C-alpha cells in the first residue's frame, strides 16, 4: 500500500532458511527493511520485547502484524491509519482479527456467531484462545460463509474501547512519539505490557475498530 513507507521484518530467528528468505525479500522490494534483534539475543517470544526500542520515531504511526496473519481486507492500512489519527486518545488500536479471543467475544455478543455456550471476555480463555479445533472451525466458518461469499462486511461491529485487560496484539497500531516517551522499553511479555500494563499506567484505554478485518 502506498500509505506504508517501510515494511520492517523483525528477524527473531536463527533459522538460516528464514533469514535467507528475508534477505531476498529485502533485495527485491525497496520498502522491506530487516531489523535484527537489538541485543543480539534470539529466544523466541522472550526476545521480541527489545524490538520496540526501534519503533519510537516521532510523526510516525507503527502497525505491528503477526507473521501468521494470512489475509486482510483491501484498504486495511488506509482505514486503520485514519482511525488511528482520528482517535489519538487510545494507546493501541486494533481491527477485528479472526481467531483473536476478544474479537471472537465481540462477534458472540453482537450475535454474529453462534457458539455452543457463552464464553467470557478473557484473552486466555481456554476454548476461544487455546483450542486448536475451535481455531480451525472458526477459520472455516469465516472463509466459507463470509470471505469466499464476499460478505465479510456483515461481521463489522463498530468501535469498542477497552481498558485494564489483556488482548492478543496480532495487529495493533501506535504512535511513535508515545512509544518514545518510555524509549520503547518493554519489560517481559510484550503483549501483557503493551495491551494492559502501560495503558493502565497512563490512564488510557485501547480500542477495537471492528469495521475492518
Language-model-detected regions and their locations in the chain:
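Short coil/turn segments at secondary-structure boundaries
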Residues: 21-23, 75-78, 106-108, 185-186
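Short, solvent-exposed loop/turn segments at secondary-structure junctions
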Residues: 14-16, 40-42, 68-70, 98-101, ...
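Active-site-proximal specificity loops/subdomain of glycosyltransferases
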Residues: 12-64, 70-76
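Active-site donor/metal-binding and catalytic loop motifs
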Residues: 176-185, 203-213
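Short, acidic, metal-binding catalytic loop of nucleotide-sugar glycosyltransferases
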Residues: 1-4
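Acidic donor-binding loop at a coil-to-helix junction in glycosyltransferase catalytic cores
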Residues: 187-196
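Long, low-complexity intrinsically disordered regions enriched in Ser/Thr/Pro/Gly
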Residues: 6-11, 24, 28-29, 97, ...
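Conserved catalytic core of nucleotide-sugar-dependent glycosyltransferases
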Residues: 79-180
Amino acid at each position: 500500500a502506498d500509505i506504508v513507507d517501510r515494511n520492517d521484518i523483525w528477524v527473531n530467528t536463527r533459522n538460516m532458511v528464514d533469514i535467507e528468505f528475508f534477505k531476498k525479500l529485502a533485495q527485491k522490494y525497496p520498502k522491506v527493511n530487516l531489523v535484527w534483534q537489538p541485543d543480539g539475543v534470539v529466544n523466541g517470544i522472550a526476545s521480541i520485547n527489545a524490538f520496540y526500542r526501534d519503533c519510537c520515531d516521532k510523526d510516525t504511526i507503527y502497525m505491528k502484524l503477526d507473521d501468521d496473519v494470512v489475509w486482510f481486507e483491501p484498504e486495511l492500512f488506509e482505514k486503520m491509519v485514519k482511525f488511528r489519527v482520528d482517535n489519538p486518545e487510545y494507546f493501541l488500536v486494533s481491527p477485528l482479527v479472526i481467531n483473536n479471543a476478544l474479537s471472537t467475544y465481540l462477534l458472540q455478543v453482537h450475535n454474529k456467531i453462534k457458539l455452543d455456550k457463552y464464553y467470557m471476555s478473557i484473552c486466555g480463555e481456554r476454548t476461544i484462545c487455546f483450542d486448536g479445533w475451535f481455531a480451525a472451525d472458526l477459520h472455516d466458518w469465516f472463509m466459507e460463509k463470509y470471505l469466499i461469499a464476499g460478505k465479510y462486511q456483515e461481521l463489522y461491529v463498530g468501535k469498542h474501547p477497552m481498558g485494564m485487560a489483556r488482548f492478543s496484539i496480532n495487529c495493533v497500531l501506535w504512535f511513535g512519539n508515545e512509544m518514545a516517551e518510555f524509549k520503547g522499553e518493554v519489560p517481559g511479555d510484550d503483549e501483557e505490557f503493551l495491551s494492559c500494563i502501560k495503558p493502565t499506567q497512563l490512564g488510557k484505554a485501547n480500542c477495537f475498530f471492528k469495521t475492518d478485518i
